[in-house]
């Protein structure tokens, strides 16, 4: 969902000539999606927020010079966001979209203020992932899911170090060993197919060690330098920062569709460029 939003927004900026359509599409679509992403994927939620922040920073002058239009945009986006919370609040959030009759009815009976409070209450456990703390040489989180992933990522580093594989990694012929650790059952998931660690960067490091990780960083740095040399700006960050942030917290890059779409679109943009600023 996050990548579809980002790609479609950039396509709109490139090909749709109407500045009003572009700016309303970007913010209203975000207003619709953010309540859903709060529950579905914290990484995707933050990715969309980062996209909005970067886009807004590039267009501060437009907002300053169009106060009336900015006020209308904020009002419409806010209304859409609130209405979207009703849909989310009436949905059984279990990564499938099953609508319970009682839940929908309960959500419908809430006022706007009560509904937002209900969303905030449900989101308290999601906010816990920000509650990180350090103890006995390791980082922990009060949020169970985040703590589970932090445990895996740190186990990868410790295991690589103990086996003197920091420089070359595990290779590609086996499941990352910490995923099959008998002292931490459940890491492979219910279907036993959970071979990776839900972090793009840790996966790269685990498979090829520091050497591969440095090559990866140099590759992506070279993309930014090529873009800067060709277009004399850093607007590519509108795509790369949200995607990399999301991939550092979630399993997005461990599938097939997400990386294919991302890298094909990245190549397309490098070849053709795009303009991030809305003309005044």
Regions picked out by a protein language model, each given a short descriptive name:
Residues 30-37, 78-84, 240-249:
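Aromatic-anchored segments of alpha-helical transmembrane domains
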Residues 52, 236-248, 252-280:
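Transmembrane alpha-helices of multi-pass inner-membrane enzymes
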Residues 1-62:
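Alpha-helical transmembrane segments of multi-pass inner-membrane proteins
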Residues 3-17, 53, 211-229, 265:
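Hydrophobic, aromatic-rich transmembrane alpha-helices
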Residues 38, 59-140, 158-162:
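A membrane-periplasm/extracellular boundary helix in multi-pass inner-membrane enzymes
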Residues 67-69, 180-186, 207-243:
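Hydrophobic transmembrane alpha-helices and their immediate junctions
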Residues 12-27, 60-70, 174, 221-238:
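Membrane-interface helix-loop-helix junctions at transmembrane boundaries of multi-pass membrane enzymes
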Residues 138-208:
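Long extracytoplasmic/lumenal interhelical loops at the membrane interface
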